[in-house]
Structures are given as C-alpha cells and as structure tokens.
Amino acid sequence: MSSVYDWFQERLEIQAIADDITSKYVPPHVNIFYCLGGITLTCFIVQVATGFAMTFYYRPTVTEAFASVEYLMTEVNFGWLIRSVHRWSASMMVLNMILHVCRVYLTGGFKKPRELTWVTGVLLASVTVSFGVTGYSLPWDQVGYWACKIVTGVPDAVPIVGGLIVQVLRGGVSVGQSTLTRFYSAHTFVLPVVAAVLMLTHFVMIRKQGISGPL
C-alpha cells in the first residue's frame, strides 16, 4: 500500500493537497448555522443522483411524460423511493438555501471583500428557483401544465420584448411539446452545468477568502 501511495505522492504531491485541506483554520465563532451551505450542496448532490436515475425511465413527450412517471412510481423497483427522495431533497435544498442566505446576510458575510461571493450565491439562488420551476412541470399533469403556462406567460407583461421572450420559453405561441422539451433540457443539462460552475466558483472564493468574522 505504501508503494502505491509513494507512486501517487511522487507525481501529484497528494500529501500537500491533503495537508492544505485538513489544516485550514476555522474561526472559533463558527457554529452549526455555518453548515447550511454545505447541507444545500449535499441536497444538490442527492438531486443529481436521483435525477440521473429517473432519466432512465422518464420520457419527455406530452403523450408519454405522465405515463412514464406513473410507471416509475408503480412498476420500477424502488422507483417511488427515488422520486420521493428527489422531491424531498428539492424541498430541503430550497429551505436550506433560504436559511443560508439569511445567515450570510445577518452576519455580514456579503461585505467587502466578499461581494463577488455574495453575487455568485445570489445567482445560485436564481438557478435553484429555476430548477423548481422547470422540474415542477415535467410530469406534465394538470398542475404541471398550468404551472408551465402561467410561468412562461409572465414575461408577456414586459414592454416590447415580452412576446418574444414568451415564444422563446414556449418554443412557439402556445404551450406544447417544444415547451416540455425546453424545460427538460434546462432541468437536466443546462441548469446543472450552470449550477456546478457557479458552485465551484463560490467554493474557490470561500476557500481563498476564508469565513467572514463575527458580528
């Protein structure tokens, strides 16, 4: 085992990396509320894992979406559990994100020199809301359909470009197959990639600047 370790150590200097990770100073004022960001990340990882599992059975078409979800819930082994965990972790992710934002705001974690960390956090909050909006409509039941119709219709109130935004979101004038395809692509590919990039940036800045001081 030591020879394997030495082989990697010689090429990657893994001991220096391990020392840097484990020797980071943690201020004495840090308490359990400073873990809310990490809990949100954990919920996101659970979302990715369970969401990936569901893609094997979900069919993003207006004629088969609901039936595929029903099949997952009733016929697939532990399918009901996978979807339930996905839904529960989504709710927990939103709740912990809100609490995390409140903690950062109340402790002044957004102040200089951590303004950019705050900006990436706000962008992550927007992405999280977008996850909820796009995922809610994927079963394509009555609730999902009308939620999709209402949400995509909101930009219509924007002067001049409102109608164009609505058509881009829906893939046409009305809600249909193109809308579901857009929501599915955004929920399973675009948003996860954007979230991962923002999270990496967020964590790198936290690692560089450290945790903010007490009030």
UniProtKB/Swiss-Prot annotation:
Keywords assigned by UniProt, alphabetized: Chloroplast, Electron transport, Heme, Iron, Membrane, Metal-binding, Photosynthesis, Plastid, Thylakoid, Transmembrane, Transmembrane helix, Transport
Major place of residence: plastid
UniProt binding sites for heme b 1: 100, 202
Entry's cofactor comment: Binds 2 heme b groups non-covalently with two histidine residues as axial ligands.
Function text: Component of the cytochrome b6-f complex, which mediates electron transfer between photosystem II (PSII) and photosystem I (PSI), cyclic electron flow around PSI, and state transitions.
UniProt cross-references to PANTHER family, sorted A to Z: CYTOCHROME B (PTHR19271:SF16)
Protein name: Cytochrome b6
Gene: petB
